[in-house]
UniProtKB/Swiss-Prot annotation:
This is Large ribosomal subunit protein uL5. PROSITE patterns: RIBOSOMAL_L5. One of its GO terms (molecular function) is rRNA binding. NCBIfam families: PRK00010.1 (NF000585). It comes from Clostridium botulinum (strain Hall / ATCC 3502 / NCTC 13319 / Type A).
């Protein structure tokens, strides 16, 4: 069964984007390529348990096992050594990606306190969009009394769009609530 958001993309978004930007070929239409969710756990250098908890939370949220991210080089001021695990990340593609995007847009973001939309300035110039989330509690899979600490995460939407404007329209048509 095709995820709801993927169906919406194929049935409505493609034609809307073709009209708006005047693409001649359906393959030119930008699409979501992947969603990368990254959780940096600063206190992992002293406390390995916190990293395990972060991995568990991320696995619950995404339904996929995260990989550990390690320090690229040693930095004495931060008390980190090379190859020390400092966080975790998940890369979602295809069905998992659409299901996660649907859950984020329709369930998680509306649960953010004082939510007025996501910033439309977080594009990187190459058609990718990044959003920071301050607490993992906005996801329905996370139970308040089961977590040890509130953690945030970065979510990056990687699209095939050439420009930020095309990427913004793609995400807007998919339902991303941009602030006015």
């Amino acid at each position: 069964m095709m995820p709801r958001l993927q169906e919406k993309y194929e049935k409505e978004v493609v034609s809307a984007l073709m009209d708006k930007f005047g693409y001649k070929n359906i393959m030119e239409v930008p699409k979501l390529e992947k969603i990368v969710i990254n959780m940096g756990v600063g206190e992992a250098k002293e406390n390995q348990k916190s990293l395990e908890a972060a991995v568990e939370d991320l696995a619950k949220i995404t339904g996929q096992k995260p990989i550990l991210t390690k320090a690229k080089k040693s930095v004495a001021n931060f008390k980190i050594r090379e190859d020390m695990p400092l966080g975790c990340k998940v890369t979602l593609r295809k069905q998992n990606m659409y299901e996660f995007a649907d859950k984020l847009i329709n369930v998680a973001l509306p649960r953010v306190r004082d939510f007025s939309g996501v910033s439309s300035k977080s594009f990187d110039g190459r058609g990718n969009y990044a959003i920071g989330i301050k607490e993992q509690l906005i996801f329905p899979e996370i139970e308040f009394d089961k977590i040890d600490k509130i953690r945030g995460m970065d979510i990056i939407f990687v699209t095939t769009a050439k420009t930020d404007e095309e990427a913004r329209e793609l995400l807007r048509f998919l339902g991303m609530p941009f602030a006015r």
